[in-house]
Amino acid sequence: MYNLGRCYKMGHGVEQNWQEAIKWYEQGAQCGNLQSMHNLACCYERGEGVKQNMTEAIRWYTAAAEGGNADDMYNLGWLYDHGEGVEQDMKKAICWYERAAEQNHPAAMNSLGECYAMGRGVPRDLETAMEWYRRAAELGEAMADYNMGWHLEQAGKLSEAYAHYRKAADGNDDSAWWALGRFYENGVVVAQDGKEARRCYETGEKLGSVKCKMRLARCKLLGIGGRRAKKAGLDLCRQALELAKESSEKEDYGYEAEMNLLRRTIAENES
């Protein structure tokens, strides 16, 4: 039933038909198939083939999670953590993250690390946070390497921070490219190299990093790693700043500092 639903969803061997996909997912879910429950929950969360309904999404994520699906344990943890579709409940978030982590779910381990690092739902404990990050990173979670790099940088362990940023960037973590760009721009641990800094920011921007977009606009305004373009650079800086104000990245490490740096750069170059 799950396979039939997936074929109709993807249009594999049949004409794509969301109604048929949902029908087969529902039948599979009613028969206890965890993957059908997962896909049905995703459809309700995203409004794919059905009207968006977070109550139904939570219902099926919970059913799949209770059945042992680690991905859905993590999904529930994230939804309760961020208050998406449900009232924020950090006790439930931590519970689901921990259950997923017990099954070696790397993203759940990283999220637990973030909770301990920020004191969100648990007492702040950086040592415990770093242990969760380490375990997640060992399983290939690039964001965990970035998070480790950030805390090592704040502790002044710059060579170790660079190594984790590099590993995270190799795993396509967009914020890691921002961090590497800063190291190259300022000559931290590595030789100062404006062109390499700019390349890092360009790579991160393509991956969706607003922090990289802000840095890249600043590079173009100041001529870092390339020709200076004052008027066009100022326009890009203003555009990047407006985008940054609305971005979901606002809670990221260093985000507010980047916005303030861009504001100062604009003010210093407007005359």
Give the residues covered by each predicted segment.
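Short helix-capping/linker turns of helical repeat alpha-solenoids
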Residues: 1, 10-12, 17, 30-33, ...
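Terminal, low-structured helical/coil segments at or just beyond the last alpha-helical repeat
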Residues: 246-271
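Eukaryotic tandem repeat interaction scaffolds
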Residues: 107, 126, 138-188, 194-202, ...
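Hydrophobic face of amphipathic alpha-helices that form TPR/SEL1-like repeat modules
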Residues: 1-10, 37-46, 73-82, 109-118, ...
